[in-house]
């Protein structure tokens, strides 16, 4: 029964952000763990000299994991300038994009200024000038605005439960299923395995491939209650 309620939260969150499939919802401890998961799993498959683009107004959770991965895998990080009103300099972003750009990860709503970048416009620019994955920090955005990941055209979204009036210690990373399927897990053990041998192991299907250890049943169910509350008061008001 508890497992059923836990899995029901995936479906609730899928509908809340209009994801394609509930299996695309990965539970984490929050945005910080989400960015660490993505940076560790994605960057290991990049080439030396490949580039990551962030902005000058990012939360530390969306900077430090990329810095650590860049140092480990010899990648380069570039930062989009912001103007005096803390808006992203779109012309500067265009100048940074190249064939070496593999990741663009930016904030959806700034916790510093309240700045709301035009995500659809930025995604279109990024995709037209590179083959980069687009990652959105939704910590402040998702609790306050209606978010449709299909409409935005993004590849990954990180969310923290406590920002959504839910419990601490729970969050979500949404990603396109074909991307999750192509990525390696970061943590090992528990139900993330399918079969274990003396010399190797095979992984469970997504989403469980990325959820090692005992699941956060209580926290996830609490997050589901927060999603219900936000849905009932309408995200468009």
Model regions: which residues?
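Pyridoxal 5′-phosphate
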Residues: 1-237
């Amino acid at each position: 029964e508890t497992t059923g309620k836990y899995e029901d939260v995936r479906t609730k969150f899928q509908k809340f952000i209009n994801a394609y499939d509930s299996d695309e919802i990965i539970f984490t401890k929050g945005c910080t763990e989400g960015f660490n998961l993505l940076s560790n799993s994605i960057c290991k498959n990049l080439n030396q000299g490949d580039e990551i683009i962030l902005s000058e107004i990012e939360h530390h959770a969306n900077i430090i994991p990329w810095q650590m991965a860049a140092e480990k895998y010899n990648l380069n990080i570039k930062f989009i300038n912001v103007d005096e009103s803390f808006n992203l300099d779109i012309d500067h972003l265009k100048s940074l994009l190249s064939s070496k750009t593999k990741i663009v990860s930016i904030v959806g709503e700034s916790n510093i200024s309240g700045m709301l970048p035009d995500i659809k416009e930025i995604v279109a620019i990024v995709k037209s000038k590179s083959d980069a994955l687009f990652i959105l920090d939704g910590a402040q955005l998702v609790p306050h605005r209606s978010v449709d990941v299909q409409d935005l055209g993004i590849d990954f979204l990180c969310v923290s439960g406590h920002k959504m009036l839910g419990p601490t210690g729970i969050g979500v990373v949404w990603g396109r299923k074909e991307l999750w399927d192509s990525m390696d897990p970061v943590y090992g053990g528990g139900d993330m395995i399918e079969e274990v041998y003396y010399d190797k192991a095979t992984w469970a299907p997504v989403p469980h491939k990325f959820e090692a250890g005992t699941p956060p049943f209580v926290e996830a169910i609490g997050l589901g209650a927060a999603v219900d509350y936000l849905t009932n008061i309408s995200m468009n008001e």
